[in-house]
């Protein structure tokens, strides 16, 4: 409400926390934070995006920011920091497999790596897709309608992948979209086992996408 440049850095942002179990695994907090007015919630996918989100938070002089970071190790989505801050649009395309696109994959944080793997797997079955990294919903929502259409209005199926509560994504995926995430409390197990339990792994996601096409 005061419009101050306060930056909150939050870690251990999902079921990727693993063995500490559901008492320590946030499943509703991203949706809760995103519902707060005048707050930018960043969930970067790798080191490069973290740098860019940090820059945006520093430049946001009249609005507080949250930067939510994962605990587990993830592969980098990008390996080179360029002059143009790609996160400044809130969402951007990081991968396109083929020209005749059927699927748009939307992801944040640690699940962006998962979305990339899903896209590659789909391509082996001649199902072509693009992957959109969406590190900040609030910034994306402020973009022009033309930009939002370029990001969202391509292909026949929109799929969100995030290890969090899923209902928030429906405004992007629509009534016929597929929202994959966590709508229950977490589990205590190695994080890869938990992702598989909640069917947030490549094979399960690919099968769900194929059923919805």
Identify the role of each PLM range.
Residues 19-36, 47-48, 52-59:
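Internal gly/pro-rich beta-alpha loop/helix module
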Residues 41-44:
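Short acidic-hydrophobic, aromatic-tinged amphipathic segments that line or gate anion-handling sites
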Residues 12, 47, 135:
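Residue-level "edge-of-site" marker
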Residues 1-13, 32:
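A glycine-rich helix N-cap at a beta->alpha junction
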Residues 1-3, 34-36, 172-174:
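Alpha-helix C-terminal capping segments
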Residues 3-6, 38-39, 156:
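Short glycine-/polar-rich loops that comprise or flank the Walker A/P-loop
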Residues 7, 16-26, 59-213:
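Thiamine diphosphate
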């Amino acid at each position: 409400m005061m419009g101050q440049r306060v930056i909150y850095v939050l870690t251990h942002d999902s079921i990727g926390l693993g063995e500490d179990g559901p008492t320590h695994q946030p499943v509703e907090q991203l949706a809760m934070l995103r519902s707060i007015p005048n707050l930018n919630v960043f969930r970067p996918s790798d080191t490069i995006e973290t740098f860019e989100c940090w820059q945006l938070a520093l430049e946001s002089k009249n609005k507080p920011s949250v930067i939510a970071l994962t605990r587990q190790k993830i592969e980098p989505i990008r390996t080179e920091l360029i002059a143009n801050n790609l996160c400044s649009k809130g969402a951007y395309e990081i991968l396109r497999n083929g020209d005749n696109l059927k699927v748009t994959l939307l992801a944040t944080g640690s699940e962006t790596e998962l979305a990339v793997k899903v896209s590659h797997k789909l391509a082996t079955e001649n199902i072509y897709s693009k992957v959109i990294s969406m590190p900040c919903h609030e910034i994306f929502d402020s973009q022009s309608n033309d930009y939002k259409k370029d990001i969202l209005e391509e292909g026949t199926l929109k799929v969100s992948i995030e290890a969090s509560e899923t209902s928030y994504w429906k405004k992007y995926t629509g009534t016929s979209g597929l929202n994959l995430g966590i709508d229950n409390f977490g589990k205590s197990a190695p994080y890869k086992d938990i992702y598989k339990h909640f069917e947030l792994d490549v094979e399960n996601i690919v099968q769900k996408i194929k059923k919805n096409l």
